């Protein structure tokens, strides 16, 4: 028989740098999860992706055990990295803060494909282009 799920926790953590400090500690502590065990397992699995922020979905079961799924980095993070920016525009559509090429958009779309609700690469590219526009990043050919 399957274990009963008591909670699902969604966090965005830097790869290989999860610590018991907030936001990890309080989020897991209130569900009775062994925080150090999660940190060790997460850091071991993400050590090769250093410097990236990764969304993680932690499923907590009735017996206080847990499993977690690491997703692809947020599109906004990948776009800022591609454009060489620290943050997006404070006034998107009015103030353009960076540029990315169609080739970069395609690479990001390929990376994000498993997590996007898109059937084709073209549809995924349109989603990423929309994210870029909302951040004040211009898409050039």
Swiss-Prot record:
In its record, the post-translational modification comment is: One or more lysine residues are methylated.
Concerning CDD domains, the annotation shows: Ribosomal_L11
Query: Which InterPro entries does the record match to this protein?
Result: Ribosomal_uL11 (IPR000911), Ribosomal_uL11_bac-typ (IPR006519), Ribosomal_uL11_C (IPR020783), Ribosomal_uL11_C_sf (IPR036769), Ribosomal_uL11_CS (IPR020785), Ribosomal_uL11_N (IPR020784), Ribosomal_uL11_N_sf (IPR036796)
Keywords linked to the UniProt accession: Methylation, Ribonucleoprotein, Ribosomal protein, RNA-binding, rRNA-binding
Alphabetical GO biological process terms = translation
Single GO MF descriptor: large ribosomal subunit rRNA binding
PROSITE patterns the UniProt entry points to:
RIBOSOMAL_L11
Spell out the coiled coil positions from the record. Answer: none
- SUPFAM superfamilies given in the database record: Ribosomal L11/L12e N-terminal domain, Ribosomal protein L11, C-terminal domain
User: Which Gene Ontology cellular-component terms appear in the entry?
Assistant: cytosolic large ribosomal subunit
Q: Which family does it belong to?
A: Belongs to the universal ribosomal protein uL11 family.
Q: How does it assemble?
A: Part of the ribosomal stalk of the 50S ribosomal subunit. Interacts with L10 and the large rRNA to form the base of the stalk. L10 forms an elongated spine to which L12 dimers bind in a sequential fashion forming a multimeric L10(L12)X complex.
Function noted in UniProt: Forms part of the ribosomal stalk which helps the ribosome interact with GTP-bound translation factors.
Q: What name appears for this protein in its UniProt entry? A: Large ribosomal subunit protein uL11
């Amino acid at each position: 028989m399957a274990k009963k799920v008591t909670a699902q926790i969604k966090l965005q953590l830097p790869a290989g740098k999860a610590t018991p400090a907030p936001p990890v500690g309080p989020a897991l502590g209130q569900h009775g999860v062994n925080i150090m065990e999660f940190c060790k397992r997460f850091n071991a699995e993400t050590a090769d992706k250093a410097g990236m922020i990764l969304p993680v979905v932690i499923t907590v079961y009735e017996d206080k055990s847990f499993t977690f799924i690491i997703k692809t980095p947020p599109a906004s993070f990948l776009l800022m990295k591609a454009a060489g920016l620290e943050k997006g525009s404070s006034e998107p559509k009015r103030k353009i803060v960076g540029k990315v090429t169609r080739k970069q958009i395609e690479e990001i779309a390929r990376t994000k494909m498993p997590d996007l609700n898109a059937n084709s690469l073209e549809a995924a590219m349109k989603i990423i282009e929309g994210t870029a526009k909302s951040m004040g990043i211009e898409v050039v050919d």
